């Protein structure tokens, strides 16, 4: 089953006269990792280059049962080029993650993510789930003012997201966790904000 990720810019602050948020655009992303090896992600960039979607085939961890494993972990690193015109800088405002957990008694899953512009250090988040669970989840990461990192003024940047999902079980009970979406709801939503600069 393919998993959908939608990356979209929601540009929130007022524009300077010489550059507008309409000039900000996203490029073709690069990706890699055990959760998104080469050839397992389909990328669609919108005509206005303001949003893109990625379809994942393998971002899922499974343990117990026929796997014979008590622990599994996968990761995915994504790099998205962001064109930033002169007179503007951008920052990440929040990112939402959607997925699914099937966790029996005593099983756990853990989702970790850090996001940053290349060459900078950004915030990192961790969310742990404990069984019994058999449901979708939504993780909302809204950055505080102290955690926001701005790009250089008028400098094109790569927006990087390094994420991992792991699951652990006991007594060979089947458990799984994924970053996914079963409908048109995005699995990951990136919201950017921007400001004028000199």
Predicted feature locations:
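N-terminal signal peptide c-region/cleavage motif recognized by signal peptidases
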Residues: 14-16
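N-terminal leader/pro-regions and domain N-caps
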Residues: 20-65
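Cysteine-clustered segments with highest specificity for TGF-beta superfamily mature ligands
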Residues: 53-55, 134-177
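Generic short beta-strand segments
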Residues: 55-63, 95-100, 162-168
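Short, solvent-exposed beta-strand/turn "edge" segments of beta-rich domains on protein surfaces
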Residues: 64-73, 82-91, 102-104
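An exposed acidic His-Trp-rich patch
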Residues: 91-144
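Proprotein-processing/basic-patch segments
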Residues: 167-198
């Amino acid at each position: 089953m393919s998993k959908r990720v939608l990356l979209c810019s929601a540009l929130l602050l007022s524009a300077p006269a010489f550059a507008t948020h309409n000039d900000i655009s996203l490029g073709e992303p690069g990706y890699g990792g055990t959760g998104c090896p080469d050839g397992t992600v389909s990328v669609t960039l919108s005509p206005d280059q303001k949003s893109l979607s990625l379809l994942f085939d393998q971002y899922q961890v499974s343990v117990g049962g026929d796997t014979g494993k008590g622990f599994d972990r996968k990761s995915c690193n994504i790099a998205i080029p962001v064109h930033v015109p002169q007179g503007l800088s951008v920052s990440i405002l929040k990112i939402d993650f959607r997925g699914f957990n099937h966790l029996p008694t005593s099983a756990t899953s853990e989702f970790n993510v850090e996001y940053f512009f290349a060459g900078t250090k950004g915030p990192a988040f961790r969310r742990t789930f404990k069984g019994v669970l058999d449901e979708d989840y939504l993780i909302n990461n809204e950055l505080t003012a102290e955690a926001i990192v701005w790009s250089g003024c008028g400098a094109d940047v790569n927006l990087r997201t390094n994420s991992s999902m792991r699951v652990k079980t006991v007594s060979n009970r089947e458990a799984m966790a994924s970053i996914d979406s079963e409908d048109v709801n995005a699995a990951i939503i990136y919201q950017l904000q921007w400001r004028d600069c000199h």
